[in-house]
């Protein structure tokens, strides 16, 4: 079974809660015999690794701009997941979850991990908060499996 991970900046050694979660989780899943590929945002990557602890790594260029970065990367990553034959796309965070229907339309099963209500953070304006809430809704209503992380 091929699992492709999207919604994270990347691993290893990239700062962030989602990133730390993924750095711990996916090597363990790969060790159990699953084929795991994690798609990283090239602008955050400081190495040229193609693998980390049995997790394959693919880097995709993404503009490093707060308001569009996650959604552009997720679009490209889901498309890449389809082209490399993913059975499951594991989407992390509510922003990237906005594109859950795209992955489902492309015929992949989707697992969504909700890392918290990002729309409650002060760094986002009204429009961004609305989009994040929509992403949360898409991630919890149109996936194959949901994982809520408190």
Label each region the model flagged.
Residues 71-78, 82, 86-119:
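An aromatic- and histidine-rich active-site surface loop
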Residues 1-3:
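Extreme N-terminal starter segment of soluble prokaryotic enzymes
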Residues 146-150:
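Conserved small/polar residues in nucleotide/adenosyl-binding loops
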């Amino acid at each position: 079974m091929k699992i492709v991970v999207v919604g994270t900046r990347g691993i290893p050694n990239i700062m962030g809660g989602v990133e730390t979660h993924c750095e711990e989780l996916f090597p363990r899943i790969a060790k159990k015999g699953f084929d795991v590929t994690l798609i990283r945002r090239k602008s955050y990557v400081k190495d040229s690794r193609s693998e980390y602890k049995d997790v394959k790594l693919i880097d995709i260029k993404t503009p490093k701009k707060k308001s569009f970065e996650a959604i552009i990367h997720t679009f490209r990553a889901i498309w890449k997941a389809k082209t490399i034959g993913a059975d499951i796309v594991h989407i992390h965070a509510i922003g990237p979850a906005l594109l859950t229907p795209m992955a489902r339309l492309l015929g992949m099963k989707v697992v969504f991990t909700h890392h918290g209500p990002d729309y409650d953070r002060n760094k986002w304006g009204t429009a961004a908060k609305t989009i994040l809430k929509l992403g949360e809704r898409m991630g919890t209503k149109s996936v194959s499996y949901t994982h809520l992380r408190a």
